[in-house]
A protein has these predicted regions:
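Hydrophobic face of amphipathic alpha-helices that form TPR/SEL1-like repeat modules
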Residues: 1-29, 33
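Residues at or immediately preceding the N-termini of alpha-helices
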Residues: 27-28, 42-45, 64, 82, ...
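Glycine-rich loop-to-alpha-helix module at the N-terminal edge of alpha/beta enzyme cores
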Residues: 30-122, 132
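Residue-level signal for inorganic ion chemistry
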Residues: 31, 67, 89, 111, ...
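Conserved C-terminal structural/oligomerization subdomain of aldehyde/semialdehyde dehydrogenase
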Residues: 32-35, 224, 261, 312-315, ...
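Short, well-ordered beta-strand elements within core beta-sheets of diverse protein domains
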Residues: 34-40, 54-61, 147, 260-263, ...
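Rossmann-like NAD(P) dinucleotide-binding subdomain of oxidoreductase/dehydrogenase enzymes
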Residues: 123-270, 407
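ALDH superfamily catalytic-core signature
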Residues: 234-387, 450, 496-500, 506-515
Length: 516
């Protein structure tokens, strides 16, 4: 039995005037409708931004330590509802339950970090070059934040935007992925019961085109001060262009083609463990999923053998069980992955499973656990012999597929790692500190792992990428405060006279001709 979900604007449920319904289904049982969603239109998004604007002034006047108490309450409610939230995530987006629990824990960790920032939204007291004059800096909220998020991390990633934005005194309009609407609804209920005033957090269920049209109108009317977007590079570029017309810099967290370099002296067992987790965890649908393993030619064959062995031994199937990964999130991603599989050519060697493509009774996988016909399950694929001009090498694949490419020198490995033009996450497995720091210095990624996988974020470390992975903005930790606050400087002259900077400064005359 499904529930009809409607947008929440100014604290009130607002069914869409457009009258369109979207059915969010369980990807492990695609006939199971998790929720029916009343899809909003562009006007609804504009109304949500108006409600946020109306609520923001009063919210910004709440002292930051008190706003921190609300964040603390959100964290406690998340902890209390951890299992229930994780079950919704597993059912709606097919994430294995153990991973879903980890995702919910990330929200609690984020709240634990930011509740203290309510007492640490520090400005500075700065000395002046004039007597009887003092200089200050202050952090002020930007105003109204519109956060547009994807469904591969349907509750953790939204918390990266919403929690610090609220803590800093902003009001938020959140547009979650419509195929993860039940997750968004459950998460919104946590915020609503934490004591947030009406209008401070608004939730709009809409598809991409209506969201873009609504955002465009809201920006024209001056109703939005900051846009955060997690999603594809192509859509992120359009949002960046739109915001640029209004002299705004959005926070863009986009795709990744994340490399893992495995050197000749690497611990291959550890490297394979990392490749298995980051390449196939969440069915390869993380922005930080491993794209290409770039392996020294002397150990490449052994690495491929071990990874093939580990992948074949892993259980794929029902996300409620103990599996490496479950189904793809939605039909749209299954369709996209089918296109990716078409990039495999005759010169590639394919490993990892008893077949390729969608798992079914006619295309079975050894050790599969679940109902293959019911869900969007796909074989894991290892493609050995990818080259720098291959589509598989150059593009984000968003599915359970890992490429393998050989290298001879570290210079060549770094060039290969940077070649696709993304810059989110990168990893190196080595025992040589000189290689570690050479790699760190020259890799374009915003995040680097050493002897660890390309996936895995901690709540107090900056998260974000460069190039095709983002515009340099960072989420998480103290660094995200610069996304949701603006610096204001103030000078206070209490001398009783006009003192002109640079012109009325007392000069001390040195004897620069002195020599010993």
């Amino acid at each position: 039995m499904s529930t009809v979900l409607t947008s929440v604007i100014g604290g009130a449920r607002v069914p869409s005037g457009a009258g369109r319904l979207y059915r969010s289904t369980d990807p492990s049982r695609t006939t199971d409708v998790v929720a029916e969603v009343s899809l909003a239109d562009a006007d609804d998004l504009v109304r949500a931004c108006e409600a946020a604007r109306n609520a923001q002034d009063a919210w910004r006047d709440v002292p930051p330590p008190v706003r921190g108490q609300v964040v603390a309450a959100i964290g406690r409610l998340v902890e209390a509802n951890k299992a229930a939230l994780a079950r919704v995530v597993t059912r709606e987006v097919g994430k294995p339950y153990a991973e879903a629990l980890g995702e919910v824990q990330e929200i609690a960790d984020t709240c634990a970090f930011f509740l203290g920032e309510g007492r640490r939204l520090y400005g500075h007291t700065v000395p002046s070059e004039m007597p009887d004059k003092q200089l200050f800096t202050f952090r002020d909220p930007v105003g109204v934040v519109t956060a547009i998020t994807a469904g591969n991390f349907p509750v953790a990633v939204p918390s990266w935007y919403i929690v610090p934005a609220l803590l800093c005194g902003n009001a938020v309009v959140w547009k979650p992925a419509e195929y993860a609407a039940a997750c968004a609804e459950a998460f919104y209920q946590v915020f609503a019961h934490a004591g947030l005033p009406d209008g401070v957090l608004n939730v709009v269920y809409a598809d991409g085109p209506e969201t873009f049209r609504g955002l465009e109108r809201a920006l024209v009317r001056g109703l939005v001060d900051k846009v955060g977007f997690t999603g594809s590079t192509e859509v992120g570029a359009r949002i960046g262009e739109l915001c640029g017309r209004h002299l705004q810099s959005p926070c863009l967290e986009l795709g990744g083609k994340n490399p893992m370099v495995v050197t000749e002296d690497a611990d291959l067992t550890l490297a394979v463990e990392g490749a298995l987790f980051s390449g196939f965890g969440t069915a390869g649908q993380r922005c930080t999923s491993l794209g290409t393993a770039i392996v020294h030619e002397s150990v490449r064959d052994e690495f491929v053998r071990l990874l093939d062995e580990a992948t074949r031994a892993a259980t794929v199937g029902d996300p409620a069980g103990d599996v490496l990964y479950g189904p793809l999130i939605d039909e749209r991603f299954a369709d996209g992955f089918e296109k990716v599989l078409g990039w495999i050519g005759p010169r590639h060697a394919v490993h990892g499973s008893s077949g390729t493509g969608r798992i079914s009774p006619s295309n079975p996988r050894d050790g599969f656990d679940g109902d293959a016909e019911a869900g969007l399950y796909y074989h894991p694929v290892i493609v050995d012999g990818v080259r720098p001009d291959d589509e598989l090498f150059l593009h984000e694949t968003f599915g359970p597929i890992v490429g393998v490419a050989p290298y001879r020198t570290l210079d060549e490995a770094i060039a290969l790692a940077n070649a696709p033009g993304y810059g989110l996450s990168a990893s190196i497995y080595t025992t040589d500190p000189a290689e570690v720091f050479a790699f760190r210095r020259r890799i374009s990624a915003g995040m680097v792992s050493v002897n660890n996988s390309t996936s895995g974020a901690e709540a107090h470390l900056p998260f974000g990428g460069n190039g095709r992975s983002g515009n340099g903005g960072r989420q998480s930790g103290i660094w995200v405060l610069d996304q949701f606050t603006r610096w204001q400087s103030m000078n206070w002259d209490f001398s009783g006279r006009l003192q002109k900077a640079q012109m009325d400064v007392v000069e001390i005359t040195p004897d620069l001709g002195f020599r010993l």
